[in-house]
Amino acid sequence: MLDICTDITGRKDLYEQNGLAVKAQIDKIKAQYAEADIQDGERKILLLRAASSFVKAKGSSGTVLGEMLCDMGCINIADSNTSLLENLSVEAIIWEELYHIFVVTMGSDTEAAKRSLENLMKENPALSTLDAVKNGRLHVMDKTLFNLKPNDRWAESYEILYEKLTEK
């Protein structure tokens, strides 16, 4: 799309700058992650979307962060256990032994969305026993970079994601 727009405006330099250069940055980040010493179990994640009135598991497709995680080579348990998409099963989450849990908020009230997540954790104390939670790998991500398309900040989004995924 950017290629077409820059054809119309006659500004191919912007396609190079805002399209190809950003793609090259992202490809470099993805290659670094692929080459990192990451075990298969460390690629296992769960993506949650939190709003003021709910917290739901999300699959890899149809969400910005889900597609980015898939693009990086992560394994989202909600993709293979689709019952999680309908009913957030604490037992299924514990059984999967996740390495990371990513949460992205939605809606205008981010604090209310975070409270929904806190309530989920309080109502299900078994979630606190997850290694991902105990070891600080429950990541609440910036919705402007990971729920909405980050536009000119795609490379920054991938860099932040890379940093979270490679934290030990």
Residue locations for each model-derived region?
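Structural recognition of the beta-strand scaffold that forms the well-ordered cores
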Residues: 43-49, 77-79, 100-104, 138-141
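Proline-aspartate-enriched helix->loop->beta-strand connector
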Residues: 90-103
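Solvent-exposed, acidic/flexible segments
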Residues: 11, 15, 19, 58-62, ...
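Flexible loop/hinge segments that line or gate small-molecule binding clefts
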Residues: 1-8
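Structured C-terminal subdomain patch of bacterial secreted/periplasmic proteins
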Residues: 103-168
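Short helix-initiation/N-cap motifs at beta->coil->alpha
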Residues: 81-90
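Basic- and aromatic-lined ligand-binding clefts that recognize polyanionic substrates
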Residues: 14-72
